Structure formats: structure tokens, C-alpha cells
Amino acid sequence: IALIGDAAHPALPFLAQGGVMAMEDAAVLAAVLKGCGDDEIPARLAAFERIRHPRTTRVMEASIRNGRAYHLDGGMRLARNAVLSATPPHLFMRQYDWLYGWKIEDALKTARIPV
């Protein structure tokens, strides 16, 4: 059994990546299981977990951080707003290059499974 999406790694909604993580999970799972025999399934499922765990953990942690930042109050909220107002959008978005630049090909290289 392989769990994907929120069943495997439920995330808070503050990064808006829940559906994306499910689609990435499905794509990686399909790739690692492609063409494998029954005797290879346990090893391929372990590879799926090795591939996905670091990224999904990072997404969940980033979502938690965003949630905290979105719910600041008082002086912290004012400071956050001042920093965000002064930050050009292209510079702000650089912090998410790791998120939006993900490529399945790069992820599969870590598994060392021919796809």
C-alpha cells in the first residue's frame, strides 16, 4: 500500500500545495513502479518514500512557517507588512524557487531506478 497526497503528508493550507503534492506523488509513484515485477514492488515503494519524503517534509514545514507569518499581530504584523511592502515581488518569489522549480527527472535520479 502506498499513501499519497494528504493521506501521506497532510499540510496546512498556507502554501497552497496540497493538491500539487498529490499530483507529484502520483507521478513519482507511477514512474518508480513502471515496468517492475511483483518481486520488485517493496523496493520500489521504498524508493518512492526516499524520493518524496524530503520534499514533502520541506513543503509541510514551509506551510507551517507561512501560517505563523500570516497570523502575526501587533508590532510583528506591522514589521512583516513593512518588509513585504519594501521587497520587490521577484525577490520575494526567489525563496520559492525550490518549490516551483521541482522536476520529476531530478527527483528520480536519487532513486537510481531506470525510468
Question: What is the predicted role of each segment?
Answer:
Residues I1-H71:
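Conserved mid-domain beta->alpha element of the FAD-binding
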Residues L84-V115:
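C-terminal auxiliary extensions adjacent to catalytic cores
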